[in-house]
Amino acid sequence: NSISICALKEGINAWDRDVDRFLNSEYVPLYNPVEEYLYDVGRWDGKDRIRALAGLVLCTNPYWRELFYRWFLSMVAHWRGVDRQHGNSTSPLLVGPQGYRKSTFCRIILPPELRFGYTDSIDFKSKQEAERYLGRFFLINIDEFDQINVSQQGFLKHLLQKPVANLRKPHGNTIREMRRYASFIGTSNQKDLLADPSGSRRFILSLIHISEPT
């Protein structure tokens, strides 16, 4: 609307349908901010920054650094579209008392250039909107994981394994696929989290002593 209004103010007869046709034409190249960021980063210099990032979380899980490393690689693989047949079906869970900066750690996982793709406000009550988040965000933090009820945990397990998001337009009957970019991480102050023990293999539990992101 704003584009067509500005055009009309300049004396250009451009209506909403004209703007829509232009934006969806070959004259406007596709822009993917995460692909551009990864391209600009350049070749790896050999320094292990992922395990160093994981090391900021002091926890009781002896496998934490390696599991976080694999999860992180899978997250980036989603961004690049390396494997479109499988979802990043695991999620780290940071468990510890309030004030241990669990959410702060989750935010700094993404570089500043990509933090617009971070959210901690997903609502599992709206299944269509929650599924839309798979293609809208790069990292979804399930803050206060212990507040999710049994049925919502079942739906979360479903989301974790989905390679794409299946969406229906408002008032429409056609379902279209949207590429998935999002991976999940969670935080909680409580240790008693998982209502369905069969789904526990999808979560990397990390009981935190203290987290020290800088």
Where do the protein language model's features map onto the residues?
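Conserved AAA+/SF3 P-loop NTPase catalytic/coupling segment centered on the Walker-B
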Residues: 139-160, 194-199
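Canonical AAA+ ATPase core
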Residues: 180-197, 202-207
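C-terminal regulatory/interaction module of P-loop NTP-utilizing enzymes
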Residues: 117-128, 191-200, 211
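Conserved catalytic/switch belt of AAA+ P-loop NTPases
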Residues: 154-176
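Residue-level detector of conserved catalytic or cofactor/ligand-binding positions
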Residues: 206-214
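P-loop NTPase catalytic core of nucleic-acid-dependent motor ATPases
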Residues: 25-135
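Long, basic/Gly/Ser/Thr-rich N-terminal segments
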Residues: 1-33
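AAA+/SF3 P-loop NTPase mechanochemical coupling elements
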Residues: 130-135, 169-187
